[in-house]
């Protein structure tokens, strides 16, 4: 009879848990005990009903309630012992350390949103190398303590600006680079109009970049290089001097190094042919250009002959072509190692006995090694003077040839542009685009002898885009050999693009896996300029 009453009472109370009251249950049980005389088992039944009750008696303080999002454990499950908290390793740049999700965290209460949640603001501003504060899953104490993570409320009240994060001084890394190190980053002012609040690297312009100078200021200097190559670092001064053609030279007695600095920092090298690519010259003399484009053949030949006369007149009068015709060099610095640095301001080239000291017609064999040390020094003097004249008058050839010839030259240039439909103008647009880039360079390889090639460059107004160090003559060795020297000079990391109209440069480019851009008409020049403007090349 007792068992039936107890089970009936359990059934009724389980169906209506909200109506369960401990005082009424106790009264029913004590009434039952009065009738049957059982008291001990009735107290255990009262405890059984009172244990799963979720309600809190009125007298119990609110602190006895479980904290929000705190893990609840059933009566039969023992709470797992918290794992030992280990401090995170030192973070080099303020990256927060992440804890591993443990097995007991899988039994989280439904009120917890996930493994990692964020608060309304950082409890304390991040300082030094400290990791940021996050609220981890399980706030009962498993992930607290030495791990540096604190409970924070959600984002949204205090906006943390990026400048509040600490900057990292670069002084601690001074042992890894010299004081002259210039990080190759773009200045912040050129990227956005408003100044950035964070610390940024600013590329400071090197003090030894040669600005645009007047032609008179470069008259007495030997080491004058206005090319687009990158300035050298201070640490490079102790290295062996490297000639501008890419070959290592022994130390001469000159105080200045003729080689342009920073050749191995060039990223892209444009190797140009001269005749029928940049300028129209040979096809004027033969009449090929006039017949192809329907021009006056007589006028074409006349203009070609007049330009040829001016070229050789300039070469003979100012560039020692009479002395150097049989001693032609591939590059202007090929004999610079024989120069002792003597002052040439009062040197008399016509009376130094250059011809008489070199017997026979074959003054030069190979690359010019003949005639003894004294004769080689006089040869080097002439090439040094040629270099000085080129650098002085490359933007003012009219001042070199004189006023009467200057007028003739200007008239001839105008007629040439009209006959060739502005061929040279289109070429100069592409050349100037390349020349304006900081890490790109124009290099000229021509089958003309070096001295007449320099005269052509000056008379056609190309001196500003071709430094004399970037001009090579392939008369003796061929263009493929010149390509190898150029690659040795600028390094294998640079990208080489060959631009020309002939088979020789195309085959040389193919052998060295260089892209080749053929120039055969005005449309090719326009397409090249368009590709450069869009930075496809």
Swiss-Prot record:
Required co-factors: Mg(2+)
GO CC terms in record: cytoplasm; nucleus
Note accompanying the cofactor annotation: Binds 1 Mg(2+) ion per subunit.
Subcellular location(s) per record: Cytoplasm; Nucleus
InterPro entries: EYA, EYA_dom, EYA_dom_metazoan, EYA_dom_sf, HAD-like_sf
EC number annotated for this UniProt entry: 3.1.3.48
Annotated stretches, region: Disordered: 210-262
Transmembrane intervals: none
Active site: 273 (nucleophile), 275 (proton donor)
Binding site for Mg(2+): 273, 275, 501
SUPFAM superfamilies: HAD-like
MF annotations from Gene Ontology: histone H2AXY142 phosphatase activity; magnesium ion binding; protein tyrosine phosphatase activity
Residue ranges, compositional bias (Basic and acidic residues): 233-248
GO biological process, one term: cell differentiation
Catalytic activity: O-phospho-L-tyrosyl-[protein] + H2O = L-tyrosyl-[protein] + phosphate
Keyword Nucleus appears in the UniProt entry: yes
Function, in words: Functions both as protein phosphatase and as transcriptional coactivator for SIX1, and probably also for SIX2, SIX4 and SIX5. Tyrosine phosphatase that dephosphorylates 'Tyr-142' of histone H2AX (H2AXY142ph) and promotes efficient DNA repair via the recruitment of DNA repair complexes containing MDC1. 'Tyr-142' phosphorylation of histone H2AX plays a central role in DNA repair and acts as a mark that distinguishes between apoptotic and repair responses to genotoxic stress. Its function as histone phosphatase may contribute to its function in transcription regulation during organogenesis.
NCBIfam families assigned to the protein according to its UniProt record, in alphabetical order: EYA-cons_domain
Family per similarity comment: Belongs to the HAD-like hydrolase superfamily. EYA family.
PANTHER family: EYES ABSENT, EYES ABSENT HOMOLOG 2
Name of the protein described by the UniProt record: Protein phosphatase EYA2
Organism: Bos taurus
